[in-house]
């Protein structure tokens, strides 16, 4: 999956699609504060990493996030850190990370068990990471 996503990420950058996506999002997000932009990017990244590999999510989301930061005149570092944190949080599905899939059978977990246990963890990470990222990288 990762081997297939790196060329996709490169193609998105080379063709300028990440710039188009970033500028389109920036038009709608221009009135939002940096906190809410980081919050939104973190949520989107967390949702994406629950479906595809975390490294592939980072390859896709990092240029988009950096483009939004550049378009709106914010420092890039907090936006990239939010992508890194969000891409590491595959707690809501058994398909988001291979470890989740491995423990599903022996633990007799159902798909809904991941939501029940992963959602509070995601909320905790959102609550702690955004203020810390703003504190450290702004």
For the regions a language model picked out, list residue spans one by one:
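Small-residue-rich segments of transmembrane alpha-helices in multi-pass membrane proteins
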Residues: 1-9, 63-73, 117, 126
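Juxtamembrane and boundary regions of transmembrane helices in multi-pass small-molecule transporters
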Residues: 84-138
């Amino acid at each position: 999956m990762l081997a297939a996503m790196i060329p996709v990420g490169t193609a998105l950058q080379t063709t300028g699609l990440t710039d188009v996506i970033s500028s389109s999002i920036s038009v709608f997000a221009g009135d939002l504060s940096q906190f809410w932009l980081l919050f939104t990017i973190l949520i989107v990244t967390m949702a994406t990493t629950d479906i595809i590999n975390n490294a592939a999510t980072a390859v896709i989301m990092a240029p988009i996030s950096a483009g939004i930061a550049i378009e709106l005149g914010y420092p890039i570092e907090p936006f990239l850190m939010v992508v890194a944190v969000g891409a590491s949080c595959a707690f809501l599905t058994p398909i988001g990370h291979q470890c989740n899939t491995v423990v599903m059978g022996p633990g007799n977990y159902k798909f809904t068990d991941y939501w029940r246990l992963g959602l509070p963890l995601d909320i905790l990470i959102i609550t702690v990471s955004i203020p810390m990222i703003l504190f450290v990288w702004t």
